[in-house]
Amino acid sequence: MERITLDFAIKAALDAAALMPEGYIYTNPDGEVAVELSLIGGGISCSYFDDKDGSPSCLVGHILHAAGITAQHIPAGHSGSGSHTLIEELEECEGLMVDTDASSFMSTIQNLQDSGVPWDDAIREGVSAYL
């Protein structure tokens, strides 16, 4: 399992965003599209991995997958939970190592993504906050 440093997390997030059309706004496996938080007063709940095929779904899921985490590693009940909570459990139960700044970056981009910010913009904001 790969240690998740800030550089690793940024690269994995950029790689995930490169797979999507420019301006991609996250759609969870249930087909719900994140919309701007200011428009409806809330965001959506992301899924780290697709329950149907196990593929990474949200930005944090892509980062975890790049580090060697699969859907089978995600404890029951963590779909839609905050990334800090999940990371703490994966560190304890699976031996995942995540640097503090990487964990904060992942939380930031997850919150932005879930409120409808396009992936490239969420990553850019996360990078500017932590570099």
Please tell me what each predicted stretch does.
Residues E2-T5, G23-E32, L37, G41-F49, ...:
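Catalytic phosphate/metal-binding cores of nucleic-acid and nucleotide-processing enzymes, i.e., regions
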